[in-house]
From Swiss-Prot:
It comes from Beet curly top virus (strain California/Logan) (BCTV). This is Capsid protein. GO terms for molecular function: DNA binding; structural molecule activity. GO terms for biological process: symbiont entry into host cell; viral penetration into host nucleus. Residues 1-12 have a biased composition (Polar residues).
Amino acid sequence: MRKYTRNTYTMSQKRKVNPQSAWPKKRRTSTTSRKYQWRRPVTKNRTLKLKMYDDMLGAGGIGSTISNNGMITMLNNYVQGIGDSQRARNVTVTKHLKFDMALMGSSQFWETPNYMTQYHWIIIDKDVGSVFPTKLSSIFDIPDNGQAMPSTYRIRRDMNERFIVKKKWRTHLMSTGTGYGGKETYKAPSMPNYKKPMNINVRNLNMRTIWKDTGGGKYEDVKENALLYVVVNDNTDNTNMYATLFGNCRCYFY
């Protein structure tokens, strides 16, 4: 086709449309119709429901004696079962700990002006043995007959990969020299005798415990990672000067 202008002319042609140059259609990957296909269900992130286990210290209101010899106890005594405080499988994860306890000094401690400090540890026993560590010397680098000043205690060199300290803290007891609940004339401003509350929260512990195929919840039923609570009084007079611990520790696990 010719197109004339005043001085010259140009030739133009209609462009032929190639049907193959158009955008290709999207092929269906499945042979079934779309309306008959199964849809994937929508899953929601549900909050994890934790179980609770209470470990009582000092049953019957008597309390557990805390001396310079120390006290070692296992906290995650989860028996296998279907209850809210029992484990359903051989692998558990302890998330949080909550201590609701109280400390009380001995009667001889209140009769004279005294000051005592208690040292507390949360320790993970990674390589559980056949015998429970009843002595402090099996964990700390101290003599077998004990040692004063618990603030200097350190994990044994040959046990530093087995016993892992997760948390430690201190508590104090102070006496004015009068029996608990007794009367005295005014002498000077002083701290009154009292029971020391101990409310400690240990969050995000996330300790994974592997159990043996025994179904029990004792130390010998654990294959890996037992949760230990250790407490020591700094007064070496274990006969007259000691502390008493009341209350329980609640373990949150799944």
